[in-house]
Design a protein with these regions (language model features):
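Active-site acidic carboxylates
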Residues: 1-90, 94, 185-196
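Short acidic-hydrophobic, aromatic-tinged amphipathic segments that line or gate anion-handling sites
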Residues: 96, 174-181
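Short Gly/Thr/Asp-enriched flexible loops that form oxyanion-binding sites at enzyme active sites
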Residues: 132-142
Length: 196
């Protein structure tokens, strides 16, 4: 991890955290882990980005949506595309709308990361085998060291979750515990954030 990590909270939105949605599953432990990370990033005034999958028209990611028809519910005014309220997203924390798995693909995330001076990434969220994995791989391909706290990401299938973390740790990122990451973050020694 560098001196100024950025946190990318991938798709921790109602559609993925609420089992009433076809895309969702109950994952309170993942939400809680993300809240702990957000608290520390906010305390140190480090950069935070949220992402959400949103489709504005039928042409966007049409092949992806044919492969996974449940994505059709992710429309701009839908409850399902809103960040889980337990994370208490602030207006100052950018929300990146995306249409594909990677948070980098066809978005301005790379420009925003460069603009804020981030030198490494902490990638969390849902789902481990999909958008978290794609974002972590693309983060590396943008030449950022990537850390993934295992408790802060999740998947509908535990075996797929574990296999994805194993593969990511082998090739693309450092998968570590939430507690270890929080210790590393505390050691950076940035001051308290201002109230936003």
């Amino acid at each position: 991890m560098g001196a100024k990590p950025a946190l990318i909270v991938v798709d921790v939105v109602n559609g993925f955290t609420d089992p009433d949605c076809a895309l969702g599953t109950a994952c309170p432990e993942v939400v809680s882990a993300n809240k702990a990370l957000l608290d520390e990033f906010r305390r140190q005034n480090l950069p935070i980005f949220f992402t959400s999958v949103v489709y504005h028209n039928k042409e966007q990611a049409s092949v992806f949506r044919q492969k996974l028809p449940a994505l059709e519910c992710l429309k701009p005014d839908s409850h399902w595309v809103k960040v889980d309220p337990l994370l208490e997203r602030r207006e100052s924390e950018p929300l990146i709308e995306k249409q594909w798995a990677s948070s980098f693909f066809a978005t301005d995330l790379a420009d925003q990361l460069a603009g804020c001076g981030a030198d490494s990434l902490v990638v969390t969220g849902l789902t481990t085998s999909g958008c978290v994995r794609a974002t972590a791989v693309d983060g590396l391909q943008h030449n950022y060291p990537v850390l993934i706290p295992r408790e802060a990401c999740g998947d509908r299938d535990l075996a797929v979750h574990e296999a994805s973390l194993y593969d990511l740790d082998a090739k693309y990122a450092d998968v570590i515990s939430l507690s270890d990451l929080l210790v590393r973050l505390c050691s950076l020694g940035y001051g308290e954030s201002t109230k936003q």
